[in-house]
Amino acid sequence: MARAFPLERVRNIGIAAHIDAGKTTTTERILFYSGVVHKIGEVHDGAAVTDWMAQERERGITITAAAISTSWNDHRINIIDTPGHVDFTIEVERSMRVLDGVIAVFCAVGGVQPQSETVWRQADRYSVPRMVFVNKMDRTGADFLKVHGQIKDRLKANAAPIQLPIGAEGDLSGIIDLVENKAHIYKDDLGQNIEVTDVPDDMKDQVAEWRTYLMEAVAETDEALIEKFLETGELSVEELKAGIRKGVLKHGLVPVLCGSAFKNKGVQLVLDAVVDYLPAPIDVPPIQGVLPNGEEAVRPSDDKAPFSALAFKVMADPYGKLTFVRMYSGVLAKGSYVLNSTKDSKERISRLVVLKADDREEVDELRAGDLGAVLGLKATTTGDTLCSAEDPIVLETLFVPEPVISVAVEPKTKGDMEKLSKALVALAEEDPTFRVNTDQETGQTVIAGMGELHLEILVDRMLREFKVEANIGAPQVSYRETIRASSRGEGKFSRQTGGKGQYGHVVIEMEPGEPESGFEFINKIVGGVVPKEYIKPSEMGMKETCESGVIAGYPLIDVKVTMIDGSYHDVDSSEMAFKIAGSMAFKDAVKKCNPVLLEPMMKVEVEVPEDFLGSIIGDLSSRRGQVEGQAIDDGTSKVSAKVPLAEMFGYATELRSMTQGRGIFSMEFSHYEDVPRNVAEAIISKNQGNS
């Protein structure tokens, strides 16, 4: 089957922003103008195409990244609409991992918000080229150039407007295209009758100034253009377009557009810019991976290359389990068998679909650069690599943040116990930041996630999708443990009980690992002092001990263990003996490595009227917070601080009463930090049942 669109005419893009910037409305308009939907759906009416879960339509926020295919100007555009709420950071993270370009949507009134910075950092982590759409230009207080300034200052981006608004707030009547030097005047409410004319006389000076600014920014990304610009002071439309594209692909330039998705102004120009400036799969560096022999390798975006794809999302669906994949190379055909190289298991591709939100189109194959979904995969979970069994490779996986909050959950009726465990398994398969475990002492089921809203929505889904009513306990902080020193540890397990005995002996070196590295195991056994078949069980024993902690029962993170020595017995050694010896060696080493308790620190931003600034700062300090910055803008004070999550429960209610309901705040996970000794002692004694 031939390609419907050549690779250079494919765009895999994400639409990302902070909550309420109008991201889903922008996606809706893109689908309307490109012909996927024939009626405009509004988020506030609960009718948006990409918000297809019941909770999304009720709450007016996007929770899961819905993938939709559309086309514009002979280009295939695959769009992922991502959530703006910080509790759903993993959804943004996983979509960034598989995208080639991003439209960052900002509100013309609110500008750069804390969540915008998080999304920007995620795009930086995966080096995703991007452009900005400053939305809601029709709102009172809209200020395009102010937002452009914030993008430069707060996000440190080389942002250059390629448009200017004609009017603002209620008088927004059109948009100036600085590249073409033309005005687009909107003649009807649906934004379909557009008159392209010369720049209005009263804007000629402003347009000339910003056009020069754009030319300078573009020239800086290309030496040939710098020379021409310095000589003539001018760049042609073709040179500008080529220069902007080159700058975007090299991460040296961020074009800034404006409009109002809700009022149907500027969306077609956004689509034009996606086609003109954002990369095709062949414009971005080939995906990297690791071969079975440990060597690094790349897979080019090419149908003729060996097949490789990344599973970036798993969803329970009325028709079975849907696994969303990003195709990086080769062709994936319906009915074929492929290798899940992450888990070393074979998978059969029973059906392939391309999605249009909750509508789907069955296809016979997916090709390099495509986004689609597979039905019928058994073992594949988020972050796994699918590839050809003849050319195995494991692609770079997703970064998954540690959960920060946990609650105990139990079914309202004993009969629902089995349904509850099924629901929890299905939800954990979909969402890697959602963890389920059983408290060894109490036997309670504990669920952990990225925030209260995250867990609330998952509990809500249990009721709606799995018909399980559950009782939820009070939220608990997900503490972690780590080490601050290095040491050696030894574990010898020897048992003679008549007949065959048990023998395992392991020697390790333990040291602090890199931040966010979790548990890292290195095998340096030489000369066969411990046979190969006992290395994995030794590692498993250490890993299990790592997960149950040593100080207060919380998982140990960022620990590097090197197995350096040991011994075995021809008859008495077994996998179980080495698993126990590995665990003993781990416990022996860790107590000599200065273990400490860690707590999640949250990045908190509070906005209050100026009069309340003093009491807000005092209150944050009393919560063990470190105030990192404050700014006053039009009588509103903004305070940013790092505060332990343990001190932030109930803050929304406190803030309301302190500010007479006029304060707002946002909170997201920042990092883990050592718990002060006096606080740690209380937590440890409580966990050991001494309090």
From Swiss-Prot:
Record-listed GTP binding positions: 17-24, 81-85, 135-138
Principal localisation: cytoplasm
SUPFAM superfamilies, alphabetized: EF-G C-terminal domain-like (SSF54980), P-loop containing nucleoside triphosphate hydrolases (SSF52540), Ribosomal protein S5 domain 2-like (SSF54211), Translation proteins (SSF50447)
Compartment(s): Cytoplasm
GO biological process: ribosome disassembly
Keywords: Cytoplasm, Elongation factor, GTP-binding, Nucleotide-binding, Protein biosynthesis
UniProt-listed CDD domains: EF-G, EFG_III, EFG_mtEFG1_IV, EFG_mtEFG_C, EFG_mtEFG_II
One GO term describing the cellular component: cytoplasm
Domain tr-type G: 8-282
Entry function: Catalyzes the GTP-dependent ribosomal translocation step during translation elongation. During this step, the ribosome changes from the pre-translocational (PRE) to the post-translocational (POST) state as the newly formed A-site-bound peptidyl-tRNA and P-site-bound deacylated tRNA move to the P and E sites, respectively. Catalyzes the coordinated movement of the two tRNA molecules, the mRNA and conformational changes in the ribosome.
Name of this chain's protein: Elongation factor G
Organism: Synechococcus sp. (strain WH7803)
